[in-house]
Amino acid sequence: MIFKKAHIALNIIMSFDRYKEVIEEGDTVIIYVNIHSMYSLEVKPEKVNKNGEVTTNIFQTSYGALKVKDLIGQRFGTKVRLSRGYAYALYPTPDLWTRTLPHRTQILYSTDISLIILQLELRPGSIVVESGTGSGSLAHSLVRTVAPTGHLYTFGKFGALFKR
């Protein structure tokens, strides 16, 4: 068993606690093709293929391919060209993140999360301890609620999930 503090992972992988205008390498972007086709994507210009070779990172959608390096320097909300259509590169809001993350664990959705935040009377500056981080759906919303002066401590049993 591996136990880690998830708030560390959230700060390294993505900047959900603050909004930014321009996409940079390492950011998480939501690729919105249509209401039924949304994908979360980490912006890395290159990736290692099955043979161990470094290649251009190309993201495939039902409307064609997107060269991930073309996202760098674009503003969030930009319409991006695919080989057979277009999509939008959106900022990962808590709701979009919950809709696009891989559901390896049971997650809470926005309506339930809103009720939890209301009942706990959370606001900027609050300090929250969460147990059972799982996919990070609740943690993402909690961080956005208590930011910029609050703090979220979240713990979970991760193993391979933490490495993703």
PLM region descriptions:
Residues I31, S83-L118:
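S-adenosyl-L-methionine
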Residues I107, T111-R164:
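The AdoMet/dcAdoMet-binding core of the Class I SAM-like
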